[in-house]
């Protein structure tokens, strides 16, 4: 890496080395050799390096915990390392900030500045600020990198080494791990070294000027590194030393600025030391690339130490750091640490000597040949360590991700590079590579360093920084690193490239660099000091940033987690390196990333580099790109990052996060989350998976801390957070699923148990949907494989799983179980028959017979969706279904078997019929027909059997005939009784049908199974005939059949028939009489129609042909379904409870119908909704307790506790009967519970539909705009009717009316009224139900009363008070108008109509208007042809009497009904409608204002009114185009009124049809957009705005304001002369706002109106949504 980095440093860090290594600027091997020679010759440089090492030691002595200010670090680096580098390159440059001079190493020297500039991000500094600064400085650094800023000739020619050659050298010569002992040092020294490394790498890999890469190492570390390894200076004390040595000790490195860095909680220094030890590691994942074999590193370090006191000091600190790291890494690491520390010190000196490249190269070379030269040795040590680190990193590349994942390094986060954990990782990872690569790299690096000492000096510095980082990271595996070093020398740059890791590496390396490079110590120390407090940014290493970070293009998907030393240690990102890299070293700096090679080094060592760092994924392939992106600066940054940085180097994670990378410190989240294959954060958050992490990923350092989910944690990072391998994930899944099926869990997991089929199986997909499993994997195949490996779970057909221990004891079934004995016998028969059939079927049958309890055989249970099990809870007894299936199979298999099974089947069928048929009610959502005797099942069976005999059986089981019934809404009370009685009655014929169906099934199964028995043939025939019948039914049920998708079309047809006609009897009954299998097709079809064992409520109350619409086909007969939904049974009418407001008893008879004697509560829309919900909840409560309550013939209301006791006892008593196999008990149970439940559910499902309003609030007022022409309706009269709130709910029992006027004989039970009911003949206060509405209702005198009682009272009052005089009767009219819209009952409708017409005939039209509202809105909701005809008839009659309300409602219906244009209108009515094109046309009554002003003589026909007309409700939106004034449309409660231009309105009035149409403000065009809202009481939003009741009416009735619209609507009804008056513009526009009082003179009024009209023209367009409420009214 050193040489590599050094070579790239030509772009940035290398510029320092450029002077010394101008010749070596070329990436040629000669340059590397020259660098090495330069290092060797640079003993003085070594001295400088020693000084730098001393500085580094100072830094490292605090274990990098006390971060010196970056300025100090920079100064020290400049003094110690920069001077040597500059000496090589130019002392002046060293004196100057290398950042400025070299843009690479200069930056490194000015690491503090660079730090501030975001160029240098020492590993130690975790400050986000530092990181940010680094990024900020990148461009600046890069520019210097582009050409040495301080006058050093850019080493493009010389210092910059040709990217190719320089890279090659660098790559070949991995900078020795600059002092494995001191990450910071290495970082500092590596600032030069790593900077060089970065530069070298960048130049080597992408070619010096990958400014972008450098930029990518935007994190302060990277930036600093990029800036002439200024960032690395802190880290690259070694780098600077190397640079000094290498470049020339000519100029003492300027005193490094030490930035106080938060003391790493973890031994970040150790990590950094490793990094510094292996610049190459910088290129390759620093963490992974451990220094060369510990012995070599130690020797080298020792040599370095010997040659450099400072280095020795640094070594000590490095040792501390490395030791800290090493403890994590292990004893070897410790030894390496010591050696690395010495080596780091030596390397720091060497690096200082301008051996940044050379040193790094030498380190790489020397890693193999430990004693390249004293100077070289120093460099070599650094290079060796760097090389070892690089190599280790390279090897660790594989583990790089692991280390990245490793949060153990996180503990070292203060170093950000996570050297400690990284080192641990590096040790294990790097040793793998070290043996070969490290030595080779070391040798190569030495050669490269020699050739490119001058050029590499800065690069070397960076390289060393990286190397130092790498040393920290990779010292333990330095031997491996050695081999890798060669690669890493190239890769060193790449390691620098990893931004996140670089930042970490740099930070870590900075401590290492401080220790390793006394020279760098100044920069590194300050960085360490300054950065110490900044642990907080460490949390960012989490993968969070990784996702954001550019993925390593070629880099390993795996990145080390925080644990990755290289990652954490990565010399502070190649930020500084970038800067130098920008110049020349910058290229290399970038390539330090490349050197690290995960990113930048892709070209040369990218792959190998990448191996070391999971970040290398970003570094190796991305390094090149990143370096390119970062440019020279990025390269320098990468190199500066050194090994650590290189690992992460090029990957400047330009993430949405601040600081480029997510990481606060500028290094993106390193370890944990960066791997390409990140572990979900939630997984990362749990340590339980730690053991699943790769060694690298796992927290290698106990001291390391890690950030997870944005939170910083101290201690080893759970490996699980890092990454789980496939086996670990599989194991975790297996354990999780085993837990789901464990006794401990199942005892309380009722959800899971309810999802089980009778055999205890649960679809794997359900398990896969659990969050804990999803957290592990989303691949069902993985889950299936994990389940297969479990010895506690059993998987069937790959899609269902259950526990192996007593699986059938867990399913919670609501269906009574049939005796297993019969099923067994049947199963045996079936087995015999099946033996003749396909073996699979036989096996299936045998399984069933053998284990009667399990309905599904393993195969069956696991049948894929073909035979989707019914709902999770099998509705039918577990055994019943299999038995039935078996019976069917038997019948098909052999006639005899069929006969035998028929007996059993008949019993089972009877039992199943009642239970399953009604259970089907629970499955109302399922589209299976209730009647598919065996048809639907056979169809599915056919499909299944075609695939597999057993499969077919499974399919059958999965779809027990009874299971797939579709049950329509039932009458709540009668359903129970009906079910109890009907099932037996209907079961008999259905059984034969069922048998026929079974035969069909058998035929299907036979076809698929190819079993050959005469019985099968007969069934086939039967099924064929049945199919034919079904086909007849198919028109409606075809869709259902299609839904079922069976193997054969015939089966499908049968399924359709079954679906259609199949009801409770569908499967239950058909199994009863297998002997009837051969029933004639016609008979079967007929039987199918009659197959239902019960009638739907609609059928009972309004008999419908069995095959008409009652058997709802989900896909076809939507209207039928809707119709049933909107039907209301007569017997349910008797259950109605009316909730009405009861006023105080009148003091005298003869009410003033207009008197509001009842203090009606003003109910807003919100309150209305609350009350409606309360009634719904109340009703649900009634029905949930109904099953029990209905049985108790008590009038008394019992407490809830008593009720529960009673109910509980009853339930318990009932449950045992369910278990009882015999059909009779079963039927009894069904009668009580199953039927009741089904009825209850079906009824509730329909009656409690959210769309059904329970409370119809009355409009608060009928205020009408006095200026608006009115309609001929009661609400627009001077004395509008008083309307009352009314609500309803459905009781659980019937309240039989004393008279038969309303009560339907159907379903009326003589004792129904005797049931203690909440409804009673006398109004009762509402029972307490837990809902806010209860208090509202009670406070406002709402009482509940049985409907028939209330109805009879209203009629009584009507008779007593006379037509139209009864308020209660009016309330009843209103109730009918709303209730019948969604709950149509023919008898109720007929009564409503007759009474309304009777009242109308006597001059009281309220009832008739309610009737018209029902017509209009009810037909819109559910079109009924007979009602539509009545609507037309009544409309014509009403119009012919001179009324317009009926016509208005008909007009509105045609307009708003979705199919209105398709309706046929009677010619006479159509003729009447021709004159009404707009809702305004119905406003024929003069405005109320005229009546008010009649006493004022000035009111003349031609007089103009002040009021602004509002468009009638029919106008959807009125756009007032003229003028800035808005028309005064104050009535907001009516959507009808939209202010319009008076002129337009006037024109409308003048030419209602013409202009309204033309202008478009007329009703039709705009009305199309209007929504008609429902009546006030309706909770559902209606497309039409209904009667006022639909929404809270705000009476904005400002008597004095003529501009205020009255509820009545717009002016359009004004007489033409009035319109003309309105049109007249007058100055009094203000009158629009002002209200003209009735007392105002007519003239004033006219003036106001005129002005209003004028203003209207000027009024800006105002869009008002008008409700069609007026049209509705």
Swiss-Prot record:
It comes from the Eukaryota. Interacts with pAbp. Phosphorylated on threonine and serine residues. During oogenesis, phosphorylation on Ser-1119 by Pink1 at the outer membrane of defective mitochondria, impairs its ability to promote local translation and mtDNA replication thus reducing transmission of deleterious mtDNA mutations to the mature oocyte. Residues 252-265 have a biased composition (Pro residues). This is La-related protein 1. GO terms for biological process: male meiotic nuclear division; mitochondrion inheritance; mRNA stabilization; negative regulation of cytoplasmic translation; positive regulation of cytoplasmic translation; positive regulation of mitochondrial DNA replication; positive regulation of protein targeting to mitochondrion; positive regulation of translation. Residues 125-137 have a biased composition (Basic residues). The modification Phosphotyrosine is found at residue 1315. Changing residue 182 to D: Phosphomimetic mutant, partially rescues mtDNA levels and hatching rate in spoon null mutants. Disruption phenotype: Mutant males show multiple meiotic phenotypes such as a failure of chromosome segregation, cytokinesis and mitochondrial partition. Defects in spindle pole organization and spindle formation. Mutant-derived syncytial embryos show a range of mitotic phenotypes, including failure of centrosomes to migrate around the nuclear envelope, detachment of centrosomes from spindle poles, the formation of multipolar spindle arrays and cytokinetic defects. The gene is larp. Changing residue 107 to D: Phosphomimetic mutant, partially rescues mtDNA levels and hatching rate in spoon null mutants. It comes from Drosophila melanogaster.
